[in-house]
UniProtKB/Swiss-Prot annotation:
Chief location: membrane
Membrane-crossing segments per the record: 246-266
Membrane protein topology class: Single-pass membrane protein
GO cellular component, one term: nucleus
Localisation per UniProt entry: Membrane
GO biological process: reciprocal meiotic recombination
Organism from which the protein derives: Paramecium primaurelia
Protein name: Uncharacterized 80 kDa protein
Keywords: Glycoprotein, Membrane, Transmembrane, Transmembrane helix
Keyword Acetylation applies: no
């Protein structure tokens, strides 16, 4: 819809000056190129009212101010505008060079009807100079614009205006193009079923509104507006998403999101798998903050192991001293018994001495027998408790080793540190991240499947050819390489009485990040468990205490024992020493039983030096340090010799000028102490 209005040049005029006439033209061209123009119809534009702009009442009008104030617009402006007659259908087609060209023309002329100024009045106005000034010819357009985003009505309206500057004596010509807007709407959402709705509207192309002026001698012609069809068309197509397209769209979005999320999930799983694999393959020297200082876990483990070894050595020393006391008591009781037997066999001994010895020795001998039996029982109990202590120390050492196995943790805290560390600089050192990077590189280097399979096949063959079943148990134990933050771990100085030079050298070798072929052996699903450590100790003990006459086997056993991790090696050596003591106690007990059975009744007690030598030979307990070496006179305690205790044989008693008056055996209440023997002579 379009309306026109011209400014009134006559001030305080009471009549109309201009008239608006619409003329429909038809231009036809025949086959010979002859052109004929025909004026089909002519209509005067009538004064506009609300009926001509009924679209103002619709909510789809863009100009909200005009929509809510249409009454004010009609009252103030529509009375001065002229519109086409109601219910008039405008027909346009073709172009200037087409066979049929139909268009409309709105002419603005000086009117000459009864309600207009007369010819004389117009000439007078011209003489007065009213027509020398220019004036405006305004248009009021309610343009139709397709909008497919509106759910119900797809046509929207835009209120706009266009004006031209006109002057009497010049004719202004303007082309108003109407462009066809084709609308096609597919409303079906089911695949294979089409429900197509089509419509079309004409919209005024405001970008093509251009005016041109032509001088004319006929002052009655002021302006002309040619309404014609535009050569261009605009097609609008809308369709709803069908179910198959919706599924495809959702699937595409899901696949895109899955690709992005899958990348992060893949990296997350890869990192988690690498950390899990690193925890299974390696042990980590994890730093811990204690009392404001950074302490590494391997250093703490060594300190705890050495503290445990001190208690083991104390127990070993205690059992050695107890064993020495038992042997001394046994030998002393035997010596007194043989003195009693010899005294009764000699007829030259004074009857008083014999009676005195008989009365004194009988209760003393019985008392010694009871004490000897009690001490033998105590010795058996010591052997039992020795085995129990060995098991307790083994369990303690295994628990210390298992608890010291630090692992890399993988979770939200680890990821947050990784992300924050990549964006920030000069932050605190992330030791766990450094350990993970080093272990990841080691995994990539060591996990070549071809190399692993070849080495496994080769080593399995060699292992079954060289070793027996027990040796394979020790050989199968694998120590994990230590992943360190620094290239070398700062080693503190430990107690020199516990650490020897070979321990330090072996520990340095272990801390180096070297991967030998043996690190690829064995089953790693359950690498270190308490049960496996117990089996390892049993095999270690069997090889350490084996008395193989074959020198090759002996050297092989020693080499295998040296391959064990230093902390485990020195812990097991202390337990092996306890086992040696236990075996020695059982051997001495068995030997005493055989000696008592095979010893003749006329056995004479030898000199004190012979008795001492026999004691040392029967109970030859080697004092062994943690590294398997003997300690010279570390635990050896000089025993009081028999001459110092005034114990003499029969010949000595007979040749003595002094007579034996009394023999007293004073026993300390504790069974672990020596028996003090005091011989009182006159």
């Amino acid at each position: 819809m379009i309306a026109f209005q011209a400014e009134n040049l006559i001030e305080n005029g009471t009549k109309r000056l201009f008239n608006f006439i619409f003329t429909s033209h038809l231009q036809m061209m025949d086959e010979n190129g002859n052109m004929t123009k025909t004026e089909i119809s002519t209509h005067k534009l009538e004064q506009c009212n609300i009926s001509h702009f009924n679209e103002f009442d619709e909510a789809s009008t863009y100009n909200v101010v005009i929509y809510y104030n249409h009454q004010k617009l009609l009252k103030d402006q529509l009375n001065d505008y002229y519109c086409l007659p109601l219910n008039y259908s405008l027909q346009i087609q073709g172009t200037q060079k087409s066979n049929i060209f139909q268009y409309g023309k709105i002419s603005v002329t000086i009117c000459s009807s009864d309600d207009c100024y007369s010819t004389d009045e117009i000439q007078q106005f011209q003489r007065l100079g009213y027509f020398n000034n220019s004036f405006k010819i305004n248009t009021l357009m309610l343009n139709r614009v397709p909008n497919l985003n509106i759910p119900n009505n797809y046509i929207s309206y835009i209120y706009s205006d266009y004006y031209i500057q006109a002057k009497i004596g010049q004719e202004i010509k303007t082309d108003v193009y109407l462009e066809q807007q084709q609308l096609s709407i597919e409303k079906s959402v089911i695949p294979g079923i089409k429900v197509l709705e089509q419509d079309h509207v004409f919209s005024i192309m405001e970008n093509k509104l251009q005016a041109s002026s032509v001088f004319t001698s006929n002052i009655t012609r002021v302006a002309s507006f040619f309404i014609r069809l535009s050569q261009s068309e605009t097609h609008y197509y809308k369709e709803y998403y069908r179910f198959d397209e919706l599924f495809s769209y959702v699937g595409g979005i899901t696949q895109f999101l899955a690709t992005i999320l899958g990348y992060f999930i893949l990296r997350y799983n890869q990192t988690g798998l690498q950390i899990k694999l690193a925890n299974s393959l390696y042990q980590f020297d994890m730093p811990e903050k204690q009392k404001g200082q950074m302490v590494f876990s391997f250093q703490l483990l060594v300190n705890k192991i050495f503290e445990s070894l001190k208690s083991i050595e104390d127990a070993v020393q205690k059992f050695k001293n107890s064993a020495h006391r038992i042997i001394n008591l046994t030998r002393l009781a035997g010596g007194l018994k043989f003195i009693n037997q010899q005294s009764y066999q000699n007829d030259d001994i004074d009857d008083e001495i014999v009676n005195h010895l008989a009365t004194q020795q009988v209760p003393q001998t019985d008392k010694l027998k009871v004490e000897k039996c009690a001490d033998h029982c105590h010795e058996s109990n010591q052997t039992f408790y020795l085995q129990q202590d060995k098991k307790k120390f083994l369990s303690l050492i295994v628990q210390l080793i298992l608890e010291s196995r630090k692992k890399l943790s993988f979770g939200v805290h680890f990821l947050a540190k990784q992300v924050s560390g990549s964006f920030k600089k000069n932050t605190a050192v992330n030791y766990q991240s450094q350990l993970f990077e080093k272990s990841r590189k080691m995994i990539l280097r060591d996990m070549d499947i071809l190399v692993i399979m070849n080495k496994l096949q080769e080593i399995e063959k060699i292992k079954h050819v060289i070793f027996n079943k027990t040796q394979r148990k020790v050989f199968n134990y694998l120590q994990k390489p230590v992943v360190c933050v620094k290239k070398k771990i700062n080693q503190d100085k430990y107690d020199q009485s516990l650490i020897h030079g070979d321990l330090k050298n072996k520990r340095d070798d272990t801390l180096r990040l070297t991967m030998s072929s043996k690190s690829l052996l064995g089953i790693r699903q359950k690498y270190n468990t308490e049960k496996k450590f117990n089996k390892l100790y049993e095999a270690y003990e069997e090889l350490a205490l084996a008395e193989d006459p074959n020198e090759t086997e002996k050297i092989m056993n020693q080499r295998l024992l040296k391959l064990v991790e230093p902390t485990i090696q020195y812990s097991f050596n202390s337990l092996v020493e306890i086992e040696k003591l236990s075996r020695q106690l059982r051997y001495n007990k068995k030997k005493r039983v055989e000696t008592q059975v095979l010893k003749p009744h006329n056995f004479k007690l030898g000199s004190s030096n012979e008795v001492e030598e026999e004691i040392e030979n029967n109970f030859d307990i080697e004092s062994i340090t943690l590294n398997g070496q003997k300690k010279d006179n570390l635990y050896k305690k000089s025993q009081p010799s028999l001459p110092e205790n005034k114990i003499k044989n029969l010949t000595t008693l007979q040749s003595s000028t002094r007579q034996l008056k009394d023999v007293q055996l004073n026993q300390i209440q504790s069974k672990q102490d020596f028996l003090d023997v005091e011989i009182i002579s006159s």
